[in-house]
Amino acid sequence: MVNRDREKRRGERISTALPVDLGGARGVALDVSASGIFFETDSSYALGNLVSFTVEINAPVGKMLLKCQGDIVRIEPRGTRVGVAVKIIESTMEFASP
């Protein structure tokens, strides 16, 4: 059953390279789903902490901001950077200011 859950989760994720604003730090989203995100950053984070971030999306209608809050569920050292997996618990989307 665990394999089916992992396969289902993988099917829902979208590989990407979107800028992430971490409120004083920057990162790059490498994959996104409706319930989570994985991003790389130079900043350090702790497993279990709450994190707020904004993903910048260039949509056909203009620049959109996906503002999220979530729980850090995994940390992966990646050379000089760190990979952070977040389970999104709250999100809103809005147009960016011109």
Feature locations, PLM:
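A short macromolecule-binding patch
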Residues: 30, 93-98
